[in-house]
Amino acid sequence: MPLSYQHFRKLLLLDEEAGPLEEELPRLADEGLNRRVAEDLNLGNLNVSIPWTHKVGNFTGLYSSTVPCFNPKWQTPSFPDIHLQEDIVDRCKQFVGPLTVNENRRLKLIMPARFYPNVTKYLPLDKGIKPYYPEYVVNHYFQTRHYLHTLWKAGILYKRESTRSASFCGSPYSWEQDLQHGRLVFQTSKRHGDKSFCPQSSGILPRSSVGPCIQSQLRKSRLGPQPEQGQLAGRQQGGSGSIRARVHPSPWGTVGVEPSGSGPTHNCASSSSSCLHQSAVRKAAYSLIPTSKGHSSSGHAVELHHFPPNSSRSRSQGPVLSCWWLQFRNSEPCSEYCLCHIVNLIEDWGPCTEHGEHRIRTPRTPARVTGGVFLVDKNPHNTTESRLVVDFSQFSRGNTRVSWPKFAVPNLQSLTNLLSSNLSWLSLDVSAAFYHLPLHPAAMPHLLVGSSGLSRYVARLSSNSRIINNQHRTMQNLHNSCSRNLYVSLMLLYKTYGWKLHLYSHPIILGFRKIPMGVGLSPFLLAQFTSAICSVVRRAFPHCLAFSYMDDMVLGAKSVQHLESLYAAVTNFLLSLGIHLNPHKTKRWGYSLNFMGYVIGSWGTLPQEHIVQKIKMWFRKLPVNRPIDWKVCQRIVGLLGFAAPFTQCGYPALMPLYACIQAKQAFTFSPTYKAFLTKQYLNLYPVARQRPGLCQVFADATPTGWGLAIGHQRMRGTFVSPLPIHTAELLAACFARSRSGAKLIGTDNSVVLSRKYTSFPWLLGCAANWILRGTSFVYVPSALNPADDPSRGRLGLYRPLLRLLYRPTTGRTSLYADSPSVPSHLPDRVHFASPLHVAWRPP
C-alpha cells in the first residue's frame, strides 16, 4: 500500500504528536527505511518506458530553443553620455580621505579594464547579426544596425577604420592616444605589407592630388587580401550632364570594410563614379575634382558639374567598385518592387560612412567579427524597448576557454544578517551599468561585432539568391536582391530611418570600448566597481548602510528624512564620478527592502510575492504519475531551490529531484511527494537575522553514543547500532536543540557546522532541517568540548564551560568588506581643551 501524505508527515516528525526524539530520530538514518520510503513514493524508479513530458506550465528544458518574439516597433534605448571620470580614485579621496587597500585595488582594476583571452577565433562578417527572426530578417538587420550605431555614437563602441586604427565618439581617456597628438597620420607598416596614404592633419586636406589610384585599396595582410575599401566606390554613369552629389569632406583614410572578398585590383581612374563618396581620400584621388582648397569635415554640400562619363566600360562589364545602394539610382527598374524606386525617393542619401570625433591606433584588427548580436525585449516587463544580446561565448568554450575570476556573492543568511534591520530603505538604479567601465583599446580586436552590409546579408539568407560571390557582382545580378518582401520592408523602414537606410546598408566593424555584457569578465568587474564605491559611501556616512550587488545599489538610514538627505549627498557624489543614475527608477521601500528577489525587513527575509505566486501556479500545473524530462526538472529545481530555505525541510526535500537530474533520467511525481512539496511551499517561514551571543549548550557524539552539556547539566545516551560519525554528530545537535531550545549550539563537527544536510540519509536530512531551523553553530575544538566526556559515557568528569562568543558573519563577500580603519579626512582626536572632550588620554 502506497505511503499516504499523513503517514509521511508523521514519519518525518513534522507533527506535534511524534514520540520521543531520542528514539524516533535515529530510525530515520536507517538505510532500509529510506529505501522503502523511496520505493513507496516512486522516487527510485528512474527507468521508465512511458514517453517523457517535456513541458510543465511555462517550463521547458533549460537548453530548449524557445524562439524569442520579435517586435517590429521596438525602440532603441537612448544612452546618456556615459564617461566615468579617469581621476575616480582622487575624487573618492577628496570625498572620504585615504582609500583602503581593497578600494584602491578594485578601482584600479577598472581604470581601464583589460581583457586578454588565450585564443580568439575570427568569424566572417556574415555572422555578425544572427538570423534569429527568419520572418523579420530585414527589419531585425536595420534595428540591430541602428542599435549598434547608437552605441557607437554614445562612445560605447570603437569603429574599425583600418587594420590599425579606429574612431570613436565621446570624451577620450589618457590611454586612448590620438594619432600623432591629434594629427591623424596613417602609419606605414612594412611588417604586414600595408601601403597607406597619409592626410596631413585632422581638418585640412593635402593640396596635391595623389594620382589616379590609391594602392591601399587592397590591403594585403597576414589574412590574405582584405575586403575592398568603400571610399572610391562609384556607380556607373550613363549619359553626361551635371550631377549633384553631396560631398562630406573628411580627414579619414581607408574605412573598415566594404562587401568582403576582393577581386583583382581595380584601376580607380577607369571606373567612373557619380556616387561621390564622402572621403577626402577620394577627393584627393580623383584629379578631376579640384583640391586646391581644403575643406573642414563639416560636410557642406558641393556642386560638381559636368563630370565626364567613362564610356570605356559598358554597364554589364567586369567588376565595379561601388556603393551597392546608390548603384540602383541609374539602373532600369526590374519590376514594380525594384529597389531603384526606393533609392530614387530622395536626392541626398547622406554619407556612405561616418567617422568618430577621435581616432586612435589599435593593435592589428582583422575585418572579421568575434561574436554575433541580436535583439530581444529589454525585460519581461518592458517589451517596447529592445536589448542587444552579444554572444561572445567562444571565450567560455573549448580547451582555450578563459577561466573567469570568481567573486563572492552574499548567501541568504549573510544578506539577512547585514540588511535585516529597522532602517528605512531606498534603491538606486545605475543606468547601463556595464557601459560605465572603460576597456583598454588592446582588448578591441578580441571583442568585435558588426555586419557585412545589407546586400550580403540578404543574399546569404535568401535561398534563391544568385549572388554567389560579392567580388563578381555585375549590374545584371545587382537586381537579384530585389524582391517584394525586401521592397515592402525597406519602404516601411524608410519612414523610421530615412537617409540612414543607406548608411546602415554598408558593412561595418565595431569593437567594444566599454565592457560588453556577453563576456564572463564583465560581472566580476562590475561587482568590484560597485562594491568599492559602496565601501567609500559607507565610510563617508558611518551611521548609514550602503550595499550593492552588481548594478543594484541600496541605501539605508534610521529615518525617512535622514534617508532623503543621504540620497541627495550620495547622488551628487556618484554624478561627480560620472556614474549615471536613472532617477525615474529610484524606489523608496520604507522598512521592507525588495532586493535580489527577497523582501528583507526587521523580521527577517522572505521571497518576493511574484516568486511565491509563480511557485503556486507551477504546483497547480504539475502532473502526477507522468515522467518529466530531467531538463524540465532543472528548471523546477531552480525555482523551488530559491525558496527552499524558507520551507520546513529546506534543500533536503528536493534531493530526489537532484538525483534524477544527475542520472539524466526522467522524474515521476507521486501524489504523496507532490502533496508533501505543495504543503512545504504553501507555508513559508522567514529566515531570521542571527544574533551575537554566548554559547551555553554543547553537543558531541561518537559512532555509538551522544553527549550534551547544557549549562552545568550533562546528559548522555547510546545508539541502537553504530552510526557514521557525521550522522551521529547531527543527531546530537538535534537532541541539544530539542532539549534546551537554545539557538546557539557548540559542536566540533564541520559538516554540522556548515548547516548543509543534503548529504545525510534523505529522511534524516529533512527532519533535521526542521528541528535545527534558525539554529546557529559555534565551532569548539574536541579537546575543549564539555560534551566530549558524556558522549564517551563519562558523566563524572566536568570540564569547565568555555566562554565562547558567537558573532554572526556577513560572509566573505567582495561586495561587503568591513574596511580597515584609515585616518579620516577629519581629525580623529578632539583637542583636550574643547568642550566636546570626554576623557582625554595622553597621545
Swiss-Prot record:
Annotated domain remarks: Terminal protein domain (TP) is hepadnavirus-specific. Spacer domain is highly variable and separates the TP and RT domains. Polymerase/reverse-transcriptase domain (RT) and ribonuclease H domain (RH) are similar to retrovirus reverse transcriptase/RNase H. The polymerase/reverse transcriptase (RT) and ribonuclease H (RH) domains are structured in five subdomains: finger, palm, thumb, connection and RNase H. Within the palm subdomain, the 'primer grip' region is thought to be involved in the positioning of the primer terminus for accommodating the incoming nucleotide. The RH domain stabilizes the association of RT with primer-template.
Note: Hepadnaviral virions contain probably just one P protein molecule per particle.
Protein family (similarity comment): Belongs to the hepadnaviridae P protein family.
GO molecular function term, any single one: DNA binding
Keyword list, A-Z: DNA replication, DNA-binding, DNA-directed DNA polymerase, Endonuclease, Host-virus interaction, Hydrolase, Inhibition of host innate immune response by virus, Inhibition of host RLR pathway by virus, Magnesium, Metal-binding, Multifunctional enzyme, Nuclease, Nucleotidyltransferase, RNA-directed DNA polymerase, Transferase, Viral immunoevasion
EC number(s) from the headed UniProt entry: 2.7.7.7, 2.7.7.49, 3.1.26.4
Region (Spacer): 178-346
Task performed by this protein: Multifunctional enzyme that converts the viral RNA genome into dsDNA in viral cytoplasmic capsids. This enzyme displays a DNA polymerase activity that can copy either DNA or RNA templates, and a ribonuclease H (RNase H) activity that cleaves the RNA strand of RNA-DNA heteroduplexes in a partially processive 3'- to 5'-endonucleasic mode. Neo-synthesized pregenomic RNA (pgRNA) are encapsidated together with the P protein, and reverse-transcribed inside the nucleocapsid.
Catalytic activity: DNA(n) + a 2'-deoxyribonucleoside 5'-triphosphate = DNA(n+1) + diphosphate; Endonucleolytic cleavage to 5'-phosphomonoester
An example Gene Ontology biological process: symbiont-mediated suppression of host innate immune response
Region (Polymerase/reverse transcriptase domain (RT)): 347-690
SUPFAM superfamilies: DNA/RNA polymerases
Start and end residues of each stretch annotated as Disordered: 220-269, 291-316
Residues the record lists as binding Mg(2+): 429, 551-552
A Pfam family assignment: DNA_pol_viral_C
Domain of life: Viruses
Site residues (Priming of reverse-transcription by covalently linking the first nucleotide of the (-)DNA), renumbered to this chain: 63
Keyword flag Secreted: no
Chain ranges of the Reverse transcriptase domain: 357-600
Gene source species: Hepatitis B virus genotype B/C subtype adw (isolate Okinawa/pODW282/1998) (HBV-B)
Sequence segments annotated as region (Terminal protein domain (TP)): 1-177
Protein name according to UniProt: Protein P
